[in-house]
């Protein structure tokens, strides 16, 4: 389930109206939600962008164009439901009647919620409060943290434990990653308690200033010398697994880990340039790997995409048509990126008025009553689930069936307004899971709830593409390269894109679950049966959007969301929720969401019809108030189910599936040859942007572990990465470089320069080539080096090569080297130049 708080809606309070809050991410807090990726566009022509946006059938043919389908911790859960060998399931009605004791109240609305901490799993709101309380209970119950409760040291240890917990570490135990890494010799001993204190201290140290590189020596400063071994262990683990010193701060981007001293670094191909692929590629490059990213679309980001919308009179806005709301910034790695990039965050305000079809606000008392009833229905389902497990009965039934049966048993929402309000909450739940409630597993649909990140939900001004472009900067990405098959064996991996093949030691597949379900990529040998079954069992759902840029904000500046009710339960998910992005997008932007069954029907409609329907709903709300709803100057309609690079929006736990399937999808195949990342491989944070991000970090660490194991056992000659004959590699690389330098960006004397593609920043890197002449005029030696764009321009302005060589040596301390001696950063630069050149050939 998406970790965005979509199951419940805060009560609208008059005193909250008019508030506007912009939040900066606090020291230990970071962000994410995952929705979808590419879009179809509804655009008026230049003459119609002012006020005459016509939606008549005749004009729609002229003024509407569609986008092409280019393509998007372990903290122990409170209760883990394990699948059991069970007898055939009973009908839901029979199970519910058996589960109701004589003491059960038939009045679901007036029943008081139990405060017993040992009661069955509560509903979404109570579940969050209880888990937060449990954090403190764990700390107080742990001798390692309660020894000095009244001292400043004790308080600091407690504070650091909470920061580590927000990142996903349990308070008094190790994560599975730490156990696999053998961070302590004895599980549960004194060393473990001390290690945890040291680990938490290092995390808190770096989180206090995420723009700096935390050194091992700095971590040692406040820890006694006898614990140096623990510091080394914790520091190495946190560094290599991406819990510290990660992100986009300049000092961090420039840092390089010495992971392969004395041996040739392994070669990794990353399939997909979504968040998971970008994060993994950047992390692997920093570790010293040779990396190439293959992306089928003509842009990075995958299901995270921001589109610039514009109209007449200079009206424009940035619209997130994919991942949009940053859900919970506490401990979220995207929050770290926001701090490093100096990005302010806009808190999504809790006010969410719900409008009846006639434009009137829903009755506040009825609204509150039904919201409470909805939460208690979920509580009942949780209690039923627990009792069925205890009685060894099958719980493999649809969530929607159980909710509807309970609704009938307790007589919830019997009049029309109550039913409309309940349907809105059910649509909201379908939004959270990107599917119909009838597809969700009652047993495991909310298996990720114990891991939800706390903190505010936020928008980022300018859209989430800011993260994407910053992560993709200077990465060697080949766009327009759709992977068709992956062959793997004991000697490496072959990745095929059309008529091209890429040889590598290891490959990381980050494509969405929908692509795996569709079988768009063939694997040779076939994926293990267990993995193929998990791919089929897990659900991959659909959410769509209509983004509309208006000439003015007619809905008001005091709210970020509002909803609309419908009398027809079958259309409850059709434009049921609107997000206002006026405060962060740069213009009057409104986004309507389409969830559940409506999201599937939406893809059968034309963009024109969809926009007409949204406008009909908006005018039904605002015209009775005397507010004119103008035509939008531009609109975008998503089509995620039809996108061949995603085939849907995000994952969910379907009937017959469980959280175990996320873990199975995350498993590598071929004895550490092909790895998998993406939100659908993250059991704790599926269906979120931060889940995709963390999965990329996880797999970078796994690839490093396997590479070290392979190097130490000499299973593969580290100098034989791609091709058997080293001479052939050198000759091919020389030919590639000659082709690149046929059209240099600058040339002067014996010097040629190639700038970083798509960047005119003075400090962006440039590849410098110098020809050293030999005795014969026709012969010579090419040497290479890296300089900034500004330095290259300064070189060109100098008088003669002698001064230029002196400038390189004396001022820059640079000695050009042969191609084979070029640094890892230089290799990455060459890969970026190749990718850019290939893209120009494909798209120009």
Curated annotation (Swiss-Prot):
Residues 154-255 form the SWIRM domain. GO terms for molecular function: oxidoreductase activity. A motif (Nuclear localization signal) lies at residues 516-523. Interacts with CZS. Interacts with OTU6/OTLD1. Disruption phenotype: Up-regulated expression of GLP2A/GLP5A due to derepression associated with hyperubiquitination of the target chromatin and H3K4 hypermethylation. Residues 1-18 have a biased composition (Basic and acidic residues). Probable histone demethylase that reduces the levels of histone H3 'Lys-4' methylation in chromatin of the floral repressor FLOWERING LOCUS C (FLC) and the sporophytically silenced floral repressor FWA. Seems to act in partial redundancy with FLOWERING LOCUS D (FLD) to repress FLC expression. Required for cytosine methylation of FWA. Controls primary seed dormancy by regulating DOG1 and abscisic acid signaling-related genes. In association with OTU6/OTLD1, involved in transcriptional gene repression via histone deubiquitination and demethylation. Belongs to the flavin monoamine oxidase family. Residues 26-40 have a biased composition (Acidic residues). One of its GO terms (biological process) is negative regulation of DNA-templated transcription. GO terms for cellular component: cytoplasm; nucleus. Its cofactor is FAD. It comes from the Eukaryota. Disulfide bonds: none annotated. Residues 1-131 are annotated as: Disordered. It is an enzyme of class 1 (oxidoreductase). Its EC number is 1.-.-.-. It is found in: Nucleus; Cytoplasm. FAD binds at residues 295, 297, 303, 679. Keywords: Chromatin regulator, Cytoplasm, FAD, Flavoprotein, Nucleus, Oxidoreductase, Repressor, Transcription, Transcription regulation. This is Lysine-specific histone demethylase 1 homolog 1. Expressed in the shoot and root apical regions of young seedlings. Expressed in cotyledons and inflorescences. Residues 46-62, 107-118 have a biased composition (Polar residues). Its main location: nucleus.
């Amino acid at each position: 389930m998406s970790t965005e708080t979509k199951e419940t809606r805060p009560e609208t309070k008059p005193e909250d109206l008019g508030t506007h809050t912009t939040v900066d991410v606090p020291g230990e807090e970071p962000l994410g939600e995952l929705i979808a990726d590419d879009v179809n566009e509804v655009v008026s022509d230049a003459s119609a962008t002012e006020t005459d946006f016509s939606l008549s059938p005749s004009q729609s043919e002229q003024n509407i164009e569609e986008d092409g389908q280019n393509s998007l911790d372990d903290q122990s859960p409170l209760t883990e439901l394990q699948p059991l060998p069970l007898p055939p399931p009973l009908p839901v009605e029979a199970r519910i009647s058996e589960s109701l004791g004589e003491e059960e109240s038939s009045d679901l609305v007036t029943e008081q919620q139990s405060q017993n901490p040992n009661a069955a799993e509560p509903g979404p709101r109570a579940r969050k409060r209880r888990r937060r309380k449990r954090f403190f209970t764990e700390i107080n119950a742990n001798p390692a943290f309660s020894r000095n409760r009244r001292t400043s040291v004790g308080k600091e240890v407690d504070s650091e434990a909470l920061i580590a917990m927000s990142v996903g570490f349990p308070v008094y135990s190790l994560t599975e990653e730490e156990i696999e890494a053998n961070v302590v010799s004895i599980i549960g001993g004194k060393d473990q308690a001390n290690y945890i204190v040291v680990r938490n201290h290092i995390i808190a140290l770096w989180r206090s200033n995420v723009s700096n590189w935390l050194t091992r020596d700095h971590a040692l400063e406040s820890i006694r010398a006898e614990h140096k071994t623990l510091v080394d262990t914790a520091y190495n683990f946190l560094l290599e697994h991406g819990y510290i010193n990660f992100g986009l701060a300049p000092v961090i981007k420039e840092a390089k880990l010495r992971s392969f001293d004395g041996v040739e670094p392994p070669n990794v191909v990353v399939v997909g340039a979504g968040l998971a692929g970008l994060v993994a590629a950047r992390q692997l490059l920093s570790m010293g790997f040779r990396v190439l990213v293959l992306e089928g679309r003509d842009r990075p980001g995958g299901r995270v995409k921001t589109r610039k919308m514009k109209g007449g009179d200079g009206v424009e806005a940035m619209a997130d048509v994919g991942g949009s709301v940053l859900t919970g910034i506490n401990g979220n790695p995207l929050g770290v990126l926001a701090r490093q990039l100096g990005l302010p965050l806009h808190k999504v305000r809790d006010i969410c008025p719900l409008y009846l079809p006639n434009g009137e606000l829903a009755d506040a008392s009825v609204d509150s009553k039904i919201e409470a009833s909805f939460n208690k229905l979920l509580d009942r389902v949780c209690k039923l689930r627990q009792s069925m497990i205890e009685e060894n009965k099958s719980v493999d039934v649809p969530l929607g069936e159980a909710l509807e049966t309970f609704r009938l048993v307790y007589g919830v929402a019997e009049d029309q307004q109550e039913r409309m309000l309940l349907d809105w909450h059910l649509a909201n739940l379908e939004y959270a899971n990107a599917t119909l409630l009838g597809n969700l597993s009652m047993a495991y649909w909310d298996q990720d709830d114990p891991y939800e990140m706390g903190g505010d939900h936020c928008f980022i001004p300018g859209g989430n593409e800011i993260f994407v472009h910053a992560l993709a900067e200077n990465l060697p990405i080949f766009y327009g390269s759709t992977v068709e098959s992956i062959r793997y064996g004991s000697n490496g991996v072959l990745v095929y894109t059309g008529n091209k093949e890429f040889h590598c030691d290891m490959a990381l597949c980050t494509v969405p679950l929908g692509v795996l379900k569709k079988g768009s990529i063939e694997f040779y040998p076939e994926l293990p049966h267990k993995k193929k079954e998990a791919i089929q069992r897990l659900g991959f759902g659909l959410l769509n959007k209509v983004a509309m840029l208006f000439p003015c904000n007619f809905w008001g500046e005091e709210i970020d969301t509002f909803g609309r009710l419908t009398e027809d339960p079958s259309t409850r998910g059709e434009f049921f929720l609107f997000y206002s992005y006026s405060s962060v997008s740069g213009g009057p932007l409104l986004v309507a969401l389409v969830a559940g069954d409506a999201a599937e029907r939406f893809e059968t409609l034309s963009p024109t019809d969809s926009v007409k329907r949204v406008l009909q709903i908006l005018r039904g709300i605002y015209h009775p108030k005397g507010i004119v709803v103008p035509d939008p100057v531009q609109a975008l309609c998503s089509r995620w189910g039809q996108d061949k690079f995603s085939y849907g929006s995000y994952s969910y736990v379907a009937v017959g599936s469980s959280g175990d399937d996320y873990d199975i999808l995350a498993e590598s195949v071929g004895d550490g040859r092909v790895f998998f990342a993406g939100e659908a491989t993250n059991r704790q944070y599926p269906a979120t942007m931060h889940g995709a991000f963390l999965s990329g970090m996880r797999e970078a660490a796994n690839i490093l572990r396997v590479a070290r194991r392979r190097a130490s056992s000499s299973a593969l000659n580290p100098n034989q990465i791609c091709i058997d004959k080293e001479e052939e590699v050198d000759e091919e690389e020389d030919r590639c470089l000659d082709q690149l330098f046929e059209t240099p960006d600058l040339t002067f004397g014996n010097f040629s320069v190639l700038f970083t593609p798509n960047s005119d920043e003075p400090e962006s890197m440039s590849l410098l080539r110098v020809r050293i002449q030999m005795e014969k005029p026709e012969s010579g030696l090419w040497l290479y080096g890296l300089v900034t764009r500004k330095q290259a321009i300064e070189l060109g302005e100098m008088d003669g090569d002698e001064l230029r060589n002196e400038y390189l040596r004396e001022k820059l301390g640079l000695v050009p080297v042969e191609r084979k001696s070029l640094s890892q950063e230089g290799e990455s630069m060459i890969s970026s130049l190749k990718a850019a050149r290939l893209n120009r050939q494909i798209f120009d």
